[in-house]
Amino acid sequence: MSGLPLLSLAIWVPIFSGLVVLLTGSDRNSPLARLLALLGAIVGLLVTLPLYTGFDTTSPAMQFVELMPWIRRFNINYHLGVDGISMLFVILNSFITIIVVIAGWKVIESKVAQYNAGFLIMSGLLNGIFAALDGMLFYVFFEASLIPLYLIIGVWGGPRRVYAAFKFFLFTLMGSLLFLISLIYLYRYSGGSFAIQAWQQMPIPMIPQQWLFLAFLVAFAVKVPMWPVHTWLPDAHVEAPTGGSIVLAAIALKLGAYGFLRFSLPIAPDASHEFSWLILGLSLIAVVYIGFVALVQEDMKKLVAYSSIAHMGFVTLGFFIFSPLGMEGALVQMVSHGFIAGAMFYCIGVMYDRVHSRMIVDYGGVVNTMPKFAAFFMLFAMANAGLPGTSGFVGEFMVILASVKFNFWVAFAAASTMILGAAYTLWMYKRVVFGAVGNHHVEELTDITSREFLVLTLLAIGALGMGLYPQPFTEVMHSSVDELLRHISVSKIQ
């Protein structure tokens, strides 16, 4: 199977499956659309698994490389490859696609084919982002992935879905304009090449590095999102359907952080070191201030959305400490957040489907009518708070340890988020699951169905498996992280 174009399959199998699902047409064929979507998502995951089993963990080089000309006039190539960093996100994305298809199985009743096709097409585009080694190819996938998510929020979202979708699209597009200008500059500066690896190797004077870094920062900070360009995220999460929130939290938020690793750090290493104080400051604001903001939320989705911003603050903090432990911890946190945030939003969706409210005050006593759900919800709430034994603990602990070696006060501020995380997550859990019943609908609730049990079990396996045995994840990324840090430790100024 190693001779197959695995990365092309990871991209085009979901996209082709989405187009096939679209052909089922009206909602009269919705059972067929759901079945084809699930089949396409499963095949999409299966074609990514050989990336892991056939991966050489001792090599930092790009593997499973595919290269062919695309637009010869501008030297734009269809150039794909993965290393120990990007490969994990291709597999995570394909896994999450199965989750969202199952999650929307009986929940979405209108435009079922279009809904499922949107997720499948977006899955392929996201895999393209993680695999692209050509700057323009990366940009095409990067921008195209906005369209399905925009439609998912705008068509199947809540009452303010159009506002939320437009705000999401506008914020991201503004950052992307500077990103495009940077790509064109690098193309001209390199003598007419869009090869990302060539950009990473060529010397660049300090002033252009600074401008490139700041342009990349604007583009990727919106995607993470970092404070203060985070305001689109709570609105998008609140209005998005459950599947949209899962993909947004589990995968889409990783694009900005991934951009730092592929562009900011290796292309502008001197500027990255010079502006590291800025990133560390913004990261600590996200970790501490946004944690306090989450503490006062009454809407469960908004609370988890703000907690995602705080958790992603750990990621950018880990990157710009410039240590192997910090960067590996940040990457573990990214993968872990995919399981945990996806599970938290799914748990909220399970309750919303029954009570049609996201407000904490409308719940209470859920454990009495939904004991199985309460047990799953407790597991994911504890993981979100960073309980040892769950994946939420591993990445945060690694970043905090790296921070201690870097600066005690940075580590102290970062560690405070574990207290804040426990406070706002367990406060929400206590009021929703225990206490007095706040809504007569709660008294009539039925426990989770077999479909919901399956989704929660799959996510629980991810959160617990990674928490109890993280080595399969860290082992894969170790060589790539070491090579990246070695690369950015050498000045490119000549």
What are these regions (language model features)?
Residues 143:
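Short phosphate-coordinating micro-motif centered on Lys-Gly-acidic
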Residues 99-107, 124-136, 149-428:
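Hydrophobic transmembrane alpha-helices and their helix-loop junctions in integral membrane proteins
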Residues 370-372, 426-494:
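Cytoplasmic/organellar membrane-interface segments at the starts of transmembrane helices
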Residues 9-29, 218, 225:
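N-terminal signal-anchor/start-transfer transmembrane helix
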Residues 1-6, 20-117, 193, 197, ...:
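Transmembrane helix-loop-helix hairpins at membrane boundaries of multipass inner-membrane proteins
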Residues 39-54, 172-181, 383, 419, ...:
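Hydrophobic alpha-helical membrane-insertion segments
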Residues 30-42, 163-173, 370-373, 450-458:
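Alpha-helical transmembrane segments and their helix-start/interface "positive-inside/aromatic belt" motifs
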Residues 102-118, 242, 250, 441-451:
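Cytoplasmic juxtamembrane regions at transmembrane-helix boundaries
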